[in-house]
C-alpha cells in the first residue's frame, strides 16, 4: 500500500504516490 491504487485518501495518509483515482 501507499501507491494510490485502491484509496487515494488512504494512500495519501500512508505517504506514497497517491493519485486521485477516478
Curated annotation (Swiss-Prot):
Keyword Repeat carried by entry: yes
A GO CC term assigned to this protein in UniProt: nuclear matrix
Compositional bias annotation for Polar residues: 11-22
One Gene Ontology term of the molecular function aspect: zinc ion binding
Compartments where found: Nucleus matrix
Keywords linked to the UniProt accession: Activator, DNA-binding, Metal-binding, Nucleus, Repeat, Transcription, Transcription regulation, Zinc, Zinc-finger
Region (Disordered), start-end ranges: 1-22
Record family assignment: Belongs to the AKAP95 family.
Protein task: Probable transcriptional activator which may play a role in neuronal differentiation. Able to bind DNA and activate expression in vitro.
Protein name: Zinc finger protein 326
